[in-house]
Amino acid sequence: MSTRRDFLQGTIVSAIGLSLPTAVVNATSVTTRRTSPPRGFADLLRAPDLVSVDTNSGIQRLVLGAGARWQGASGLAVDTRETHGALRIGLMSPALGVRRLHLRWRTRMDTARLFLGDAWERGYGDLEWRSLAPDRAMPWYVATWDGTFTHAYGVRTGAKAMCFWQVDPAGISLFADVRSGAAPLQLGDRTLSVCDVVSRAGHAPESAFVALHAFCKQMCAKPRLPAQPVYGSNDWYYAYGRNSAETFLRDAERIVELSPAHDNRPFAVIDDGWQPGRGADKSGAGTWEHANEKFPDLPGLITRVKTIGARPGAWYRPLEAPTSAPASWRLARDPNALDPTVPEVREKISADLTRMREWGFDLIKHDYSTYDLFGRWGFEMGTSLTKNGWTFSSGPNRTTAEVIDDLYATIRSAARNTLIIGCNTVSHLSAGYFEMCRVGDDTSGTEWSRTWKMGVNSLAFRATQQGAFYTADADCVGVTNAIPWALNKQWLDLLSRSGTMLFVSLAPDALGAEQKADLARAMAIASVQQPIAEPLDWQRTTSPERWRLMGKDRAFDWSGEEGAAPG
């Protein structure tokens, strides 16, 4: 059992300084429109050349009228107005249900050699610069590179639609999915602010990484960031749910021993395994009022962890339906998940998080909410996102993105100043709500190839979001005897010097003198803010081996003696 998906299937710039090089900082003050745009840059602040809308009565191609308003039949209209450095997209449809908007700008895009998009939630080892593929859906933003310039196009964080891009030789298209679950959106008299389209022209000689990081900062005006670098332990990749009060205390003691003695204290996180449903009584799944019998006095245990010198954290699954939940609370797509549009469900989530905060947890990692809503992992969502035939309890009057926004706002409000890690969250919608985001799928304490694929890839291709959207979490170093230390220590070294967060899972029988020395060195580095790691060969591979770390170029060997395991 090496992944959380395996387990599921088996059981049915802030106070934290970015310390960026001057070139990166200067690159953030770029205007979005120029009188003479550089080669290959598409001006997306102008009116699109085509606007069409997929409705419950068919696809309508709208006609541009006065005042940047595109008009169709039955009162259907789309506004495309430039405001505050963006093209703001507004939707009105008093009579027709709407599935998706398509906006297209005709412009030559075939001068670019490579293209990079983002992911709906986490990366799955599948992020990469690729040559032109017209049907490739790229969530949230797309960067283009022609060998000199890196141009970028996207929507600001906090969009009210699930947005993706497609690029072909003759133009660039934005698709905005405004469905409510799988049902056409019924707006009535409401006007939906769909998204804000932004773009950034590249400059020579900035690298593609510097350009994309600057664009990520442009897309998110107000990231919520922790006051200090985040580092510590999480027990999942050695315990895999077989944790207890004793292992929690032991982990806290060990991470404190390995960490520097300054005021930025390490975290000790109990992952999945402490809650009632993972104890002897399986009927407690989805309840969080108390811990299971393995943690008989959780509030007292939390106090002991703090006395040891660690900051306690815990895992939480907000949309898991308790067996006692009434049918009215359950999601139409899957009754095992809660429907967050139900007021009582939001009250339950708020009460759960308030309780965990009052117990004394300094960090809460909430998980599974995207899977519980859509019924698909990020790599399965594609352009359809979810299966057909369902909507939310409140009716199809709000987009799925709006429902997610309400859920995240509920979590944030209840957590107050407790740090939040979003795992399996919609990254572009979580920015500004949560301090940290798991940017890739699970690494492993049993399979090196999985850590190599998921961890290295997600760090390389989403480190551009570090400090711009949130603190990026490329996942843990699973310190166990199942993975050769010669390989794992490289992942540890990269993460510790990356400027992102560092968590380790520490199997007691895998901690020899060499491991302890390497871990102590890594914790000392990670506890102080470092410059963001820049992958140097990321345009040639999905798992970069050459990196710029703390101002120096480094090379890693991820292959080991055996190379990658079969997929």
Which positions does each model-derived feature cover?
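Secretory targeting signals
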Residues: 1-2
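N-terminal export signals
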Residues: 6-27
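Cleaved targeting-peptide boundary
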Residues: 28-34
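Carbohydrate-recognition beta-sandwich/jelly-roll modules
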Residues: 37-266, 363
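A generic structural motif
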Residues: 116-119, 262-272, 530-540
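Active-site-proximal substrate-binding groove within the catalytic cores of carbohydrate-active enzymes
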Residues: 177, 188-196, 234, 244, ...
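Residue-level signal for short, function-critical loop segments
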Residues: 237-239, 318, 500
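Aromatic- and carboxylate-enriched substrate-binding clefts and catalytic-loop regions
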Residues: 264-481, 515
